[in-house]
Design a protein with these regions (language model features):
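N-terminal catalytic or cofactor-binding beta/alpha core of small enzyme domains
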Residues: 1-229
Length: 229
């Protein structure tokens, strides 16, 4: 039986869409470093859950976990990566930015809304995080836990996230935190109006390979669903 979960994996993509290609100056390595490296492997759980959504588009080009009007350096269409590397030789004109949103951003958000009504009890926005904070992000240079679960602004019931933390702590030997260093993002805050949501951040530190991390994530999620009944 599939787990009654909706998994969102918004930052696993590596593709620069054609609308942005004439402007983007990032190398493939820089694009990968700005995204959630390892997420495509760790969260390859589509066959295990009721609903699943991901994208091939790189986070550096369209960040699906930002508000559509967030036009800062690390906003929905970025000027710089999380390593403070310029994304574009010259920033795309307004019509190109709007095309990126219409073609890649809004369809993702609409699909999450549609999937929320598909017999799921919890949405999980799945990410990987650097072992230490990058220059642009919470806690630059600070060591991070193995797992961070977030429900900032009450995106899921507190007893749920506490029991979810316990399930992750049972299978991961390293620290599992709630709302530290992350407190959730646009996806969890916005779509919590439709369904309870949590944000899941798994460290990229090499304490396990991707397959082992995937198995532990699946085990923790399965145990949590069993505990909820």
């Amino acid at each position: 039986m599939k787990l009654p979960l909706l998994l969102s994996v918004p930052h696993a993509g590596l593709r620069v869409p054609p609308e942005a290609e004439p402007y983007c100056i990032l190398t493939p390595r820089q694009i990968a470093a700005d995204g959630d490296e390892g997420a495509a492997g760790i969260y390859a759980l589509e066959s295990d859950v009721v609903a699943y959504q991901t994208t091939a588009v790189a986070r550096a080009i369209v960040d699906l976990n930002r508000a559509s009007d967030d036009r800062g350096p690390d906003g929905v269409v970025k000027t710089h990566t999380c390593w403070n590397v310029p994304v574009y030789r010259s920033f795309p004109p307004g019509d190109v930015v709007e095309s990126l949103l219409q073609l890649y951003y809004w369809p993702y958000q609409r699909e999450l809304s549609r999937l929320a009504g598909r017999g799921v009890i919890l949405g999980v926005d799945c990410h990987t995080m650097l072992a230490q904070g990058p220059p642009i992000g919470p806690g630059p240079g600070v060591d991070r836990p193995w797992v961070c679960l977030s429900n900032g602004e009450g995106t899921c019931p507190q007893p749920w996230i506490e029991s979810l933390r316990n399930c992750f702590q049972e299978v991961f030997a390293g620290p599992v935190t709630i709302n530290d260093p992350f407190q959730g993002g646009y996806i969890t805050r916005t779509h919590a109006a439709e369904l309870p949501w949590v944000q899941l951040e798994l460290s990229r530190a090499p304490f396990l390979d991707l397959a082992a991390k995937r198995l532990l994530v699946l085990t923790a999620l399965t145990n949590w669903c069993d505990s909820i009944g």
